[in-house]
Amino acid sequence: MTDLTKWISADELALITPVDQQWLLGVFERFGGYPELEQVWAVMDEPWRELRCDPEVMDQRIGAYYSHPVWLLNGLFIEQHQQSIENRERFRDWVVKQKPKRVVEFGGGFGGLARMIGDAMPSVEVEVIEPHPHPVAMARAGKTRNVRYQPELSGEYDMIIATDVFEHVPDPLQLVFETANHLRRGGQYLIANCFSPVMRCHLPQLFHFRHSWDHALNVMGLRPAEQVVYGRAFQRQGSLQLAPAHQVEKHSRALWHVTQYLPGRVGRPLTKALLALS
């Protein structure tokens, strides 16, 4: 039988339940170690199907899915996957250049990016907000003095970061609005989404945002700024307004019935032009 300490330290194994250890062991034996990226996506679809999750119904099945050890696998995987590491390094380098004093990674998962930022900027307060924090992730964060997990946002931040978060929630604009109200005026919201069907937990009713996300946030009061890796920075301009953003969402969803069949190089500018007229 494979020894999990080949991939996970004994100290961290002690923080993983025997049931979850057995599940991880099955995955590592199945793939001869860590799966490849596309294989991880496929493995993450398995409990979604087993639990019979419905992307239109946010019930206990969804809660069970996000508590499944597949998310521990995901967290461990991205900590050693070279492309994922390089993406986080580039995000970190951009954050460092902005010189924030208080940063929060919202939906930060395993907290890898937060730890990178904390190590690079030891005088900066870095928080991680994660509804399902794993003890292994919290233990790793505990090794970086200025990084800590918190149950919710509090006060005002110079920067909020959300990578691969909003494609998982039924009303992402509401969540952006609520979180961005903790962003100081002139502060930056770094967002990277994947509104594409690479995994079943990416809600298909949100795929229209592939062409309209920036516009929706702009009318909310978050001005699109520079592109950062596969995401974009948005700067808070003043008071935020949710209703205009939801109106953009309504029109975007209607346009998607047609634009989803067009190449992105056509669908995106067409959507932008039509939304400007609405």
Model regions: which residues?
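Conserved N-terminal segment of class I S-adenosyl-L-methionine
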Residues: 1-157, 200-277
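Class I S-adenosylmethionine-dependent transferase superfamily signal
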Residues: 117, 179-180
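Catalytic core segments in nucleotide and nucleic-acid processing enzymes
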Residues: 150, 181, 188-189
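A conserved beta-strand element that flanks and buttresses the S-adenosyl-L-methionine
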Residues: 161
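Hydrophobic adenine-recognition pocket in adenosine-nucleotide-binding enzymes
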Residues: 165
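A short, conserved alpha-helix within the catalytic core of class I
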Residues: 169-178
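Helix-to-beta-strand junctions that scaffold the AdoMet/dcAdoMet cofactor pocket
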Residues: 169-170, 183-185
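Conserved beta-strand signature within the Rossmann-like core of class I S-adenosyl-L-methionine
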Residues: 186-194
